[in-house]
Structure formats: structure tokens, C-alpha cells
């Protein structure tokens, strides 16, 4: 499978063809877990160090027949009920005054491009933060955003759900780059450690750690 088909299966509980985002093999929309839980008043978050229209994060908010339909996928943020989305910027948000940014703000969805700016957004306001990794500053967005994610989503009264993706393990696998695979895996491992620590303190949190597919055959002779 690929990230689109696997991401859709994880987000919806229904298998589909490769390259599908939130649709079945015939192109019909499938309700995702973000939509199902939001309808019950549960706070929802989608976090990734990939671009915001990457196959895995988009499977939790979009419904498109092809993973490369980046503009259409980004526009599905206008109708997604997700309370918090953090991922790297993409072409649809190339300018701060892009049409999509204006449309989101017209729907009272805040849009920011740096993680610290989230502190300026009311906890009850939906927000999209276009923040990627900054290796020059040793900034890993999935690690650095965790406490903020928990603070914002736990403000609701009916619990929360969040999907957090460490996407770059896969990117290292595609390139058969063992250093990147290990480095990104260690970053993800630190994130899981933070999540487990929170779950130990909270007592009512379920954590699932999953991979959607293997890339690069790192376990074989490609290293």
C-alpha cells in the first residue's frame, strides 16, 4: 500500500485503493475519525512534520480521489471540523494573504506560521499552524508542539483525539538514507515518550503507535 491508501484505512476504518485520500475505491467520500468524533463534541488534532497536504495528515481531513491534488486537498480544510492542524506549509499557502488563508479566516479559523503564535489564539478557536521542522535550530515540530497540542485539545469537556505523524522516517527510507531513518525514528521515539508520560499522569488516555507501510527495505542489504 501507499501512504494515501494506508492513511485512509487508518483514518476511516475502510480499505481503499492506493493514492485515494478519504475516498473509497469508487471515489465516494468516507467519514474519517476526525469528523466522527467532532460530531460527538470531541476535540480533534492533526499533527505532522510533512506538508499539510501530505497523504497521511490529509487522510484525516480531506476527501479527494488523488493524493497529488494538493490544492483541492488543502481546500478541504475549509470544511473539516478539525480543531487543530499543525504541519509544514505548502504551495496553497505560499503567501500569508493567499486566497485559501483569507477563506479560512472568514470562517473564523486562525492561520499562523510559527508555533509560538498559537498562544495568541483562544483555546476555543480552530487553528491551522503552518510550521515545519527547522534543523538549523534543532527544532522538531512533532516534539516541540506536543505540550501545546495537549493544552489546546484537553481544554474541551469531552476528551480529545490527535494523530501525530513522524513522516520523515519514510522519506529517509525512500532514499535508502540510514542516518535520516535513525535520526527521525529517534525523534519520533522521544515524542512517544512524552505521550506515554502524559498518559501515565492522565490515566484515561489510549495511545496507539502504528506504521502504515515499510519503505526502503532497511532490514536488508540496502544500508
What are these model-predicted stretches?
Residues 1-7, 54-220:
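A post-motif C-terminal structural segment
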Amino acid at each position: 500500500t501507499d501512504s494515501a491508501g494506508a492513511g485512509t484505512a487508518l483514518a476511516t476504518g475502510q480499505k481503499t485503493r492506493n493514492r485515494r485520500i478519504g475516498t473509497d475505491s469508487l471515489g465516494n467520500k468516507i467519514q474519517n475519525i476526525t469528523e466522527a468524533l467532532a460530531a460527538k463534541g470531541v476535540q480533534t488534532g492533526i499533527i505532522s512534520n510533512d506538508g499539510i497536504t501530505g497523504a497521511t495528515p490529509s487522510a484525516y481531513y480531506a476527501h479527494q480521489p488523488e493524493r497529488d491534488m494538493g490544492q483541492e486537498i488543502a481546500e478541504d480544510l475549509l470544511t473539516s471540523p478539525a480543531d487543530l492542524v499543525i504541519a509544514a506549509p505548502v504551495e496553497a499557502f505560499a503567501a500569508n494573504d493567499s486566497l485559501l488563508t483569507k477563506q479560512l479566516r472568514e470562517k473564523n479559523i486562525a492561520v499562523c506560521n510559527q508555533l509560538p503564535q498559537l498562544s495568541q489564539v483562544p483555546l476555543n478557536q480552530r487553528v491551522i499552524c503552518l510550521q515545519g521542522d527547522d534543523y538549523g535550530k534543532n527544532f522538531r515540530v512533532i516534539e516541540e508542539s506536543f505540550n501545546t497540542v495537549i493544552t489546546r485539545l484537553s481544554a474541551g469537556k469531552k476528551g480529545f483525539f490527535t494523530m501525530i505523524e513522524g513522516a520523515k522516517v519514510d522519506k529517509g527510507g525512500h532514499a535508502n538514507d540510514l542516518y535520516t531513518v535513525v535520526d527521525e525514528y529517534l525523534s519520533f521515539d522521544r515524542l512517544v515518550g512524552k505521550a506515554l508520560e502524559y498518559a501515565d499522569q492522565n490515566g484515561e488516555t489510549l495511545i496507539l503507535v502504528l506504521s502504515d507501510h515499510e519503505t526502503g527495505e532497511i532490514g536488508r542489504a540496502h544500508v
